[in-house]
């Protein structure tokens, strides 16, 4: 019971903070949220994808890299994020799509087998994105990656799924961090409208491609 109460307090704190942030931003009639601009070289890592292949971030130097942290056992937010990744890919033209790679990084060490991320890839239709990689590994391999990108993860009371930091990172072809997007899938406030995640991703992908 004690662990449940701790989890509930933490969950309510995170939710309240998120609501407070967006309410404050909208009440001040700020510009639509576009994400947080980042700088610096994206930390490299090597993990295993849903096909059992070793994959590192540096393998994709020369391409725009779009990656997010996902719970392989998630039933709510992560499948929605997956849908927006698929939609973002569909909105790219043929030339653009060849210059972009989409990755997911597992945050669930209780569902970290290759079979887990393969099953989730199929369930969320992420195999519709050519070159998609859902990366996983041991706790010892995953936790340093979470730390490098400021991702926190803790088990939900159901014992299977994980409450974790949401968001999508964009890295340019020189492996420089460009954007972190942590946003509701659509927010309206007065005259300002935050773009859906898929459209925001496409917007930033095209900006990065123009720069290179």
Report residues per predicted region.
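N-terminal targeting signals for export/organelle localization
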Residues: 1-44, 48, 208-212
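Short extracytoplasmic
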Residues: 33-70
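Extracytoplasmic
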Residues: 40-42, 60-64, 97-102, 129, ...
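Short active-site neighborhood of thiol/selenol oxidoreductases, capturing the structured segment around
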Residues: 55-85, 102-103
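Structural microenvironment flanking redox-active thiols in thiol-disulfide oxidoreductases
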Residues: 82-145
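Structural micro-motif
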Residues: 131-132, 143, 147-155, 163-169
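Thiol-/selenol-based redox modules, centered on thioredoxin-like
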Residues: 156-212
């Amino acid at each position: 019971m004690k662990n449940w109460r701790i989890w509930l307090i933490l969950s309510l704190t995170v939710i309240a903070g998120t609501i407070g942030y967006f309410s404050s931003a909208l009440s001040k009639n700020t510009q639509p949220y576009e994400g947080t601009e980042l700088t610096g070289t994206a930390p490299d890592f090597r993990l295993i994808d849903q096909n059992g292949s070793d994959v590192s971030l540096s393998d994709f130097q020369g391409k725009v890299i779009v990656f997010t942290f996902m719970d392989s056992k998630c039933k709510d937010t992560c499948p929605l994020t997956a849908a927006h990744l698929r939609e973002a890919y569909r909105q790219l033209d043929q030339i653009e799509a060849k210059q972009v790679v989409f990755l997911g990084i597992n945050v669930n060490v209780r569902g970290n087998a290759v079979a887990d991320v393969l099953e989730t890839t199929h369930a969320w239709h992420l195999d519709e994105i050519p070159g998609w990689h859902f990366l996983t590994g041991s706790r010892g391999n995953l936790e340093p990656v979470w730390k490098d990108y400021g991702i926190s993860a803790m088990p939900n009371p159901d014992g299977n799924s994980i409450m974790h930091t949401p968001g999508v990172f964009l890295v340019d072809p020189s492996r420089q961090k460009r954007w972190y997007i942590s946003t509701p899938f659509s927010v309206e406030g007065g005259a300002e409208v935050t773009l859906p995640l898929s459209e925001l991703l496409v917007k930033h992908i095209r900006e990065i491609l123009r720069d290179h």
